[in-house]
UniProtKB/Swiss-Prot annotation:
One of its GO terms (biological process) is translation. Heterotrimer of A, B and C subunits. Pfam families: GatC (PF02686). Belongs to the GatC family. The keyword Ligase applies. SUPFAM superfamilies: Glu-tRNAGln amidotransferase C subunit. GO terms for molecular function: asparaginyl-tRNA synthase (glutamine-hydrolyzing) activity; ATP binding; glutaminyl-tRNA synthase (glutamine-hydrolyzing) activity. This is Aspartyl/glutamyl-tRNA(Asn/Gln) amidotransferase subunit C.
Length: 99
């Protein structure tokens, strides 16, 4: 699958990125490579391979798994205790998206 310059610009717009012409060309090449790699992965025969819920590593299979048990939620006052700014029971944060 070949990605077009128009598609790169569209994705950049969704991510609110301002790319130069050189960056757009480089992204086009990079994204083509990623999509080509994904296409090759899709060709791998996984028949008979059991689905996994997580990637295994050099440890016991259940090393990162624990029972899922409910705990009481953190209270509003405790949650706001270390917030640099808060008001009316909400965190106050600086505006990060301008559109």
């Amino acid at each position: 699958m070949k990605i077009t310059e128009k598609e790169v610009r569209y994705v950049a717009g969704l991510a609110n990125l301002n790319l130069t012409e050189q960056e757009i060309a480089r992204m086009q090449v990079d994204l083509d490579g990623i999509l080509e790699h994904m296409a090759r992965l899709n060709e791998i025969d996984t028949e008979g391979v059991a689905p996994m819920s997580q990637v295994l590593f050099e440890a016991e299979e259940t090393a990162t798994l624990r029972p899922d048990s409910p705990i009481p939620p953190l209270g509003n006052q405790a949650a706001m205790a270390n917030a640099p700014q808060s008001g009316a029971g909400y965190f106050k944060v600086p505006k990060v998206i301008e559109r």
